[in-house]
UniProtKB/Swiss-Prot annotation:
Protein name according to UniProt: Low-temperature-induced cysteine proteinase
Highest classification ranks of the organism: Eukaryota, Viridiplantae, Streptophyta, Embryophyta, Tracheophyta
Disulphide bridges, residue numbers: C39-C81, C73-C114, C172-C223, C256-C268, C262-C283
Tagged with keyword Disulfide bond: yes
Gene3D superfamilies assigned to the protein according to its UniProt record, in alphabetical order: Cysteine proteinases, Granulin
Organism: Solanum lycopersicum
């Protein structure tokens, strides 16, 4: 994970006095548990839940926010239904100046074209975000005592998948693959636990939540939950409610050739090429992207160097810092996104 927002705000200190337990559900700052369905958008649900809660804590208004806006519009580094990171979601909302409501931009359980009009409906904003000191459950406890916190954990293991209720103490590794939110902590019969808010629906586990053992021997926490904790920061009011305005002009899709096109804001990349002719086009979910030579992946314009073997993108040759390469999706026939288009291929 690339992060510029490391913070010692919640680093444990001598004399810290924390509540023995806290359950943010009882504080009225969490909306009902949502269901991401078959879309790999857990990162969006985690980030949104954290933003919903800090907005409620600061303003007193509990507003359900839009995961679909993140899935459709946050495409600089996140990949919609193919995964993402909560920190990048926070960055998107900060740069965008806010995020729309769930009611106005509802969840569709699939990737879609960014609705520019609703993207500009900035109902709730955050000021920044910070990362909790990693591999430190005491620091995480201190953070959760102040607000719900986004985390990632390994959820693909057999024990985790078959867990039904009670405090989870099963076997799992630290290959974190699922974004959730820690919504509190407590102790039962001498065992410390975290209250974890999932995004698999309210009928899953304990009404959509689960309890995971806390203060284990591993510094990374059970299932790696202390590896990537972060939280949004909000200090000011939300933007004023904008006056109704007509939808922004919709940009035409990108034409790859006379038969194929990609959605607006994406780049045409050839998948099947013979000599200088392309027989099948794909779409990289970024504007101005670099098409990698493997005819499968692509890189953001600010990380233009393709490292095909590693599946990463670098800012320059030999630079060890990079981001994960993105996958292309198949282009659509001309007319699939409506009339119009422009040539823009790489």
């Amino acid at each position: 994970k690339l992060s510029k927002n490391k913070s010692d705000r919640y680093l444990p200190k001598v004399g810290d006095s924390l509540p023995e337990s806290i359950d943010w559900r009882e504080k009225g700052v969490l909306v009902g548990v949502k269901d991401q369905g078959s879309c790999g958008s857990c990162w969006a649900f985690s980030a949104v839940a954290a933003m919903e809660s800090i907005n409620a804590i600061v303003t007193g208004n509990l507003i359900s926010l839009s995961e679909q806006e993140l899935v459709d519009c946050d495409r600089s580094y996140n990949e919609g239904c193919d995964g993402g990171l909560m920190d990048y979601a926070f960055e998107f909302v900060i740069k965008n100046g806010g995020i729309d409501t769930e009611e106005d931009y509802p969840y569709k359980e699939r990737n879609g074209v960014c609705d520019q009009y609703r993207k500009n409906a900035k109902v709730v904003k955050i000021d920044s975000y910070e990362d909790v000191p990693v591999n430190n459950e005491k620091a995480l406890q201190k953070a959760v005592a102040h607000q719900p916190v986004s985390i990632a954990l390994e959820a693909g293991g057999r024990d985790f998948q078959h867990y039904k209720s009670g405090i989870f103490t099963g076997k799992c590794g630290t290959a974190v693959d699922h974004g959730v939110v820690i919504a509190g902590y407590g102790t039962e019969n001498g065992m410390d636990y975290w209250i974890v808010r999932n995004s698999w629906g309210a009928n899953c586990r304990e009404n959509g939540y689960l309890r995971v053992q806390r203060n284990v021997s591993s510094s990374s926490g059970l299932c790696g939950l202390a590896i990537e904790p972060s939280y949004p920061v909000k200090t000011g009011p939300n933007p004023p409610k904008p006056a109704p305005s007509p939808p922004s002009p919709v940009k035409p899709p990108t034409e790859c050739d006379e038969y194929s096109q990609c959605a607006v804001g994406t780049t045409c990349c050839c998948i099947l090429q013979f000599r200088r002719s392309c027989f099948s086009w794909g779409c990289c979910p970024l504007e101005g992207a670099t098409c990698c030579e493997d005819h499968y992946s692509c890189c953001p314009h600010d990380y233009p160097i393709c490292n095909v073997r590693q599946g990463t993108c670098s800012m320059s040759k030999g630079n060890p810092l990079g981001v994960k390469a993105m996958k292309r999706i198949l282009a659509q026939p001309i007319g699939a996104f409506g009339n119009g288009g422009k040539k823009s291929s790489s």
